[in-house]
């Protein structure tokens, strides 16, 4: 029971950090913040403007017009991503809990298979006469139906009562 509670808690944590694709859009948005413009909608000209101006002023002479790759590579290497660490920690706990649940399931399945195998082995050793079983079943069904139709239950009950009274006296 505690394992299920832990799984539910971890599932809720992982949902908070999940990435969602906006319907009708081709790019992904992280988190729950307000949606910004898609790449085709917007500020590419604004971003390209200062970068191109810096290239023209000589700040990045070797980059020229294609500054995007070199400009952003350096800060990504130095920046620590706490969301990613928190997400990987939650995912690690979820995967550990799932592995434990899988082990429990496998143990249960093996025990069920062993029990089923033992039952089948006992059935093979015990003699079962199908013909005798069918005869007994048929006779019980016929006798029950006849006693219901003819009201023989009352007759049988009376006879049993009479025999018991005779035995007691």
Swiss-Prot record:
GO cellular component terms, semicolon-separated: cytoplasmic ribonucleoprotein granule; nucleoplasm; nucleus
Keywords in alphabetical order: Cell cycle, Cytoplasm, Differentiation, Nucleus, Repressor, Transcription, Transcription regulation
Predominant localisation class: nucleus
Name by which UniProt lists this protein: EP300-interacting inhibitor of differentiation 1
Positions occupied by motif LXCXE motif: 150-154
Tissue localization of expression: Expressed in all adult tissues examined and during embryogenesis.
Subunit-structure text: Interacts via its LXCXE motif with the entire pocket region of RB1. Interacts with EP300, NR0B2 and TRIM27.
Other remarks in the entry: Inhibition of MYOD1 may be partly due to the ability of EID1 to bind and inhibit EP300 histone acetyltransferase activity.
GO biological process: cell differentiation; negative regulation of DNA-templated transcription; negative regulation of transcription by RNA polymerase II
GO molecular function per UniProt: histone acetyltransferase binding; transcription corepressor activity
Name of the coding gene: Eid1
Localisation: Nucleus; Cytoplasm
Function: Interacts with RB1 and EP300 and acts as a repressor of MYOD1 transactivation. Inhibits EP300 and CBP histone acetyltransferase activity. May be involved in coupling cell cycle exit to the transcriptional activation of genes required for cellular differentiation. May act as a candidate coinhibitory factor for NR0B2 that can be directly linked to transcription inhibitory mechanisms.
Interaction with NR0B2: annotated segments: 54-120
InterPro entries xrefs: EID
Stretches for region Disordered: 31-50
């Amino acid at each position: 029971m505690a394992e299920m509670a832990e799984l539910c808690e971890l599932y809720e944590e992982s949902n908070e950090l999940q990435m969602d694709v906006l319907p009708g859009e081709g790019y992904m948005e992280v988190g729950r913040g307000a949606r910004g413009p898609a790449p085709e909608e917007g500020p590419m000209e604004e971003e390209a403007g200062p970068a191109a101006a810096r290239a023209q002023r000589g700040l990045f002479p070797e980059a020229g017009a294609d500054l995007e790759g070199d400009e952003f590579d350096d800060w990504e290497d130095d920046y620590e991503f706490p969301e990613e660490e928190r997400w990987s920690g939650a995912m690690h706990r979820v995967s550990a809990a799932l592995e434990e649940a899988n082990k429990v399931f496998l143990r249960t399945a093996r025990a069920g298979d062993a029990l089923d195998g033992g039952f089948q082995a006992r059935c093979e050793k015990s003699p079962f006469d199908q013909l005798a079983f069918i005869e007994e079943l048929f006779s019980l069904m016929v006798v029950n139906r006849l006693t219901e139709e003819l009201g023989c239950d009352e007759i049988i009950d009376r006879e049993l009562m009479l025999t018991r009274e005779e035995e007691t006296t």
